[in-house]
A protein has these predicted regions:
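Acidic, Mg2+-coordinating catalytic module of metal-dependent nucleases/exonucleases
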Residues: 191-212
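Amphipathic alpha-helical surface "interface" segments used
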Residues: 34-39, 219-226
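Intrinsic-disorder/low-complexity linker and hinge segments
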Residues: 41, 210-221
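ATPase catalytic-site recognition across NTP-hydrolyzing enzymes
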Residues: 1-54, 59
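Mg2+-dependent endonuclease catalytic cores in nucleic-acid-processing enzymes, primarily RNase H-like
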Residues: 64, 70-188, 211-212, 222-226
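Short, polar loop/linker segments at the starts of domains and inter-domain junctions
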Residues: 1-5, 187-193
């Protein structure tokens, strides 16, 4: 299990979880993001499915749009709508990408109960009724686990990167660069608004390639659909 963990997680997370070292949380939440090595020129391939992470904060509602190739994920677009609801997000996605592409949505697990639109419908049911393939966990992952999952895909222990962001996704890039921890805590700061797109990305990555602080890595999840 330890050898598998070395392959699946980044060095800092490995030291913290397996060697019992104290890791200072000061500074950037997504410390493995590099504005050159993780940023690429990339456009949507209209022949391949879309994988969209989604955060349901209504101001703004945020979605990061990606495509997966083998063990790498490329974020190629982002959707940001202020003062919005799930119906409007669905319409925007359909307007941008049409109805012919296969679309997977990875929303906030709170979507099972949360209702940002009228009519008593949950956010999850709206996405499902729109024809999207919705992939969601039964409950929220620990914030620490979700952040570790993202950092371990931004750069793993071998120095390999598995998450890439198109230059056009300026909000996502800014968020990954600038979100920091609250002083003297391991809680990501949400005051500056960098959290929404980061959370959207995190829900998707945590679903596809989860890590846990219990480090149960004997059967790692690859970039495949459950």
């Amino acid at each position: 299990e330890i050898e598998q963990a070395k392959q699946d997680i980044d060095i800092r997370t490995f030291r913290q979880e397996f060697e019992g070292t104290f890791e200072n949380y000061a500074g950037a939440v997504y410390y493995n993001f590099h504005p050159v090595d993780n940023v690429v020129k990339r456009q949507i391939d209209w022949t391949k499915p879309l994988h969209i992470g989604m955060d349901f904060n209504v101001d703004p509602m945020s979605a990061c749009v990606s495509q997966i190739e083998k063990d790498k994920v490329y974020f190629v677009d982002e959707v940001i709508i202020y003062g919005s609801n799930t119906d409007e997000m669905v319409q925007e996605i359909r307007d941008r990408y049409g109805t012919k592409m296969q679309i997977f949505i990875y929303p906030d697990p709170a979507s099972k109960q949360r209702k940002t639109s009228a009519g008593g419908r949950t956010d999850l049911s709206i996405l499902q009724n729109a024809g999207f393939k919705v992939k969601v966990k039964h409950k929220h992952p620990a914030i620490r686990d979700r952040v570790n999952a993202v950092n371990s895909r931004l750069k793993d222990s071998k120095g390999e990167r598995h998450i890439f962001v198109s230059q056009s996704c300026k909000t996502l890039i800014k968020g990954l660069q600038r979100q920091i921890y609250k002083e003297n805590t391991n809680i990501p700061d949400k005051e500056d608004g960098f959290d929404h797109m980061n959370d959207a990305l995190g829900y998707m990555i945590d679903y596809l390639k989860p890590l846990t602080t219990q480090a149960n890595f004997s059967s790692p999840t690859r970039w495949t659909m459950k």
